[in-house]
């Protein structure tokens, strides 16, 4: 068999040989700078050049420095500050440096603008406001001359906020007018400077409203004053009232667009110009109307005078708010409300002034009802003498008194005992004459304190009492009783079968009221509800002081009010109360039920005893449990199913472990054990001992 040729086979081209191209070491090659790259570099430098002083830019050749005599040759469109090329305006006489001079503060001193051929030298302060795009604070007497002299400047798109530029065909270039022509601008309409180009067409024409001749100051002096004035940050435009007062002070008369004196110069159609917004400033909110009764004293005064409205000087009537309800409130309710809300010290408003829903006034911080305009007298309004009698007769509820105290500026006079503040809870309802015939006659009764010492359901009783006092339930459930902490006069019918009572009882007692007494409303309170402050509501809810006071007063009142009754009537009433109480007590949940529902807490001793019992049961169970060894023996647990866990102390595993080394005592014990094993290993039965090698004869 011939041996294989020893020459190795020719090397084939590797499958991945092309990868070498990608993994070559990197070589830096110098790139030729392209024209587009150079152009973008110039644009970027021009953008950055906004932050550099002018001489440096001229040195680097980024700005063409046109000499001042070279007025006649305007360059083509100069580049704007943000590097874009400008839209061509044929008639705008500007040089390329002119804009730079506009947008940057002039570092090399003042030079006159190339677009102007005015003989007067313009002071630096006059040019500066235009260059900084700041709105110089023009005092009311100083007309803004320089704003109108300057020709319209194109503003870069970055500075003009969201304003849409108008098409070029609309823009009429403003020819520079000599300063002698410029009429002083009226102080109300001094516009803050924005670029004239982006103003609405109606505003491009300068405002040329003339003042009386006494006001016109010589123009040279004005420009000098303007130059002296320091640059200030722009102030917010004053609100309408202040501007009105200024006008009346300056001109001796109020300038309205309708009543302005005509002058020789043509006046554009009268219009109100909102002061245009400076490009750097955020938009100023429109001035607020001044008669929002922001002065509470003014509001109080106008309330007291009831009709002679005193509003601040520059106030306009405020827009009417939508009425609170779709249906107008009843006139009786309105009169009641007026009666309740009027401070006691003020004279009562005559009946002809008590109007139906008054025109809503603007929201005031302290809700003071605006004085109502006089209206022809209403037929439904009761005569004032009756109203006054009514007021003096019924005690004023406490929450209404608080309302009055909050509303009136003067301290309220102290009332006599009949007018003492009283909670609505204890006001009795009179039954109308129509109902008296149909319904059973009710008897007021003083109930002594019927409170079980271990009573847990006060809430039920309180809710029961509420239902007895609310007007609708007094008709539907005539059998309600008040049982609670406060003894008071309660309405109980003189004779009614108890079965009817019990049916009623089942209908409406709710256990959910845990808030204390919920007070009912009178009919005229519905309208009053919106007006009441939170403090009054709080007092209305929890008027405990009034409850106590009425509780004290009740016994004396009851002596006078209650007629003498026969023994049978008293027994009947007591029987009714007794049946009600029995029924209530029979319905009470037992202590066990309450404990189950976690309402009643158990006694501490009982709780501990229960704990002990549980512990004892558990230990007994544990003691009877089989051990692990037993379970393993009985093959219930396999050896790997139970792992004993012991507590091991943490120790350093690399350190010396002395417990692993055997002490001499350990060794002796081990040896002894081994010897014992050996000695017993060969133990044999006596009968077979002779078979062994080691035996004594």
Curated annotation (Swiss-Prot):
GO molecular function: actin binding; protein phosphatase 1 binding; protein phosphatase activator activity
RPEL repeat start and end residues: 42-67, 579-604, 616-641
Keyword terms, alphabetized: Actin-binding, Cell projection, Cytoplasm, Developmental protein, Neurogenesis, Repeat
Composition skew (Pro residues), residue ranges: 317-326, 370-380
BP GO terms, sorted: actin cytoskeleton organization; closure of optic fissure; enteric nervous system development; negative regulation of integrin-mediated signaling pathway; neural crest cell migration; neural tube closure; positive regulation of catalytic activity; regulation of cell cycle
The keyword Cytoplasm is annotated on this UniProt entry: yes
Record InterPro entries: RPEL_repeat
Chain residue ranges for the region called Disordered: 63-381, 450-569
GO cellular component: cytoplasm; lamellipodium
Subunit structure: Binds ppp1ca and actin.
Family indicated by similarity: Belongs to the phosphatase and actin regulator family.
Record-given protein name: Phosphatase and actin regulator 4-B
Organism (species): Xenopus laevis
């Amino acid at each position: 068999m011939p041996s294989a040729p020893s020459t190795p086979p020719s090397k084939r081209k590797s499958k991945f040989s092309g990868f070498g191209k990608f993994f070559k070491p990197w070589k830096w090659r110098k790139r030729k700078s392209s024209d587009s790259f150079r152009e973008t570099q110039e644009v970027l430098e021009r953008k950055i050049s906004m932050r550099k002083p002018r001489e440096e830019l001229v040195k680097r050749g980024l700005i063409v420095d046109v000499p001042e005599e070279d007025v006649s040759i305007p360059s083509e469109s100069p580049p704007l500050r943000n590097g874009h090329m400008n839209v061509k305006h044929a008639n705008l006489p500007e040089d390329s440096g002119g804009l730079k001079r506009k947008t940057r503060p002039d570092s090399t001193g003042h030079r006159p603008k190339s677009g102007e051929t005015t003989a007067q030298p313009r002071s630096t302060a006059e040019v500066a406001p235009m260059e900084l795009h700041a709105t110089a604070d023009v005092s009311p007497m100083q007309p803004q001359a320089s704003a109108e002299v300057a020709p319209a400047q194109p503003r870069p798109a970055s500075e003009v906020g969201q304003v849409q530029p108008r098409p070029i065909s609309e823009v009429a270039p403003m020819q520079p007018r000599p300063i002698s022509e410029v009429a002083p601008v009226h102080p109300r309409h001094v516009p803050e400077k924005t670029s004239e180009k982006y103003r609405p067409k109606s505003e491009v024409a300068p405002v040329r409203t003339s003042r009386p001749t006494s006001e016109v100051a010589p123009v040279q002096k004005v420009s000098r004053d303007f130059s002296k004035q320091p640059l200030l940050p722009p102030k917010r435009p004053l609100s309408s009232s202040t501007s009105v007062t200024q006008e009346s002070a300056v001109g001796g008369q109020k300038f309205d667009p309708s009543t302005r004196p005509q002058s020789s110069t043509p006046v554009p159609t009268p219009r109100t110009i909102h002061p245009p917004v400076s490009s750097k400033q955020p938009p100023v909110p429109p001035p607020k109307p001044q008669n929002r009764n922001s002065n509470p004293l003014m509001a109080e005064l106008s309330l007291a005078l009831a009709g002679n409205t005193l509003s601040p000087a520059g106030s306009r009537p405020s827009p009417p708010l939508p009425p609170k309800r779709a249906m107008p409130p009843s006139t009786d309710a309105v009169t009641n409300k007026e009666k309740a809300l009027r401070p006691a010290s003020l004279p009562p408003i005559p009946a002809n002034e008590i109007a139906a829903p008054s025109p809503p006034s603007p929201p005031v911080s302290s809700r003071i009802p605006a004085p109502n305009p006089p209206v022809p007298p209403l037929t439904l309004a009761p005569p004032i003498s009756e109203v006054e009698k009514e007021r003096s007769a019924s005690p004023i509820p406490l929450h209404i008194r608080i309302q009055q105290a909050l509303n009136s500026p003067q301290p309220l006079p102290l009332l006599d005992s009949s007018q003492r503040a009283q909670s609505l809870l204890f006001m009795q309802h009179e039954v109308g004459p129509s109902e008296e015939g149909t319904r059973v006659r009710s008897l007021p009764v003083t109930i002594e304190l019927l409170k079980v010492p271990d009573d847990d359901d006060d809430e039920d009783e309180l809710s029961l009492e509420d239902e007895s006092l609310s007007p609708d339930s007094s008709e539907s459930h005539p059998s309600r009783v008040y049982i609670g902490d406060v003894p008071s006069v309660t309405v109980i019918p003189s004779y009614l079968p108890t079965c009817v009572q019990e049916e009623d009882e089942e209908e409406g007692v709710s256990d959910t009221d845990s808030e204390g007494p919920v007070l009912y409303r009178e009919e005229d309170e519905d309208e009053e509800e919106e007006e009441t402050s939170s403090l009054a509501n709080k007092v209305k809810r929890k008027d405990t002081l009034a409850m106590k006071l009425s509780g004290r007063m009740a016994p004396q009142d009851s002596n006078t009010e209650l007629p003498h009754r026969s023994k049978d009537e008293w027994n009947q009433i007591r029987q009714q109360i007794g049946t009600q109480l029995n029924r209530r007590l029979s319905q009470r949940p037992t202590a066990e039920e309450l404990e189950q529902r976690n309402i009643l807490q158990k006694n501490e001793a009982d709780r501990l005893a229960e704990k002990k019992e549980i512990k004892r049961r558990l230990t007994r169970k544990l003691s009877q449990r089989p051990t692990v060894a037993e379970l393993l023996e009985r093959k219930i647990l396999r050896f790997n199913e139970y792992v004993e866990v012991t507590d091991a102390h943490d120790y350093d595993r690399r350190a010396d472990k002395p417990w692993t080394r055997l002490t001499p005592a350990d060794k002796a014990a081990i040896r002894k054990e081994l010897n014992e094993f050996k000695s017993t290993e060969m133990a044999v039965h006596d009968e077979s001992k002779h078979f062994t090698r080691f035996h004594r004869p």
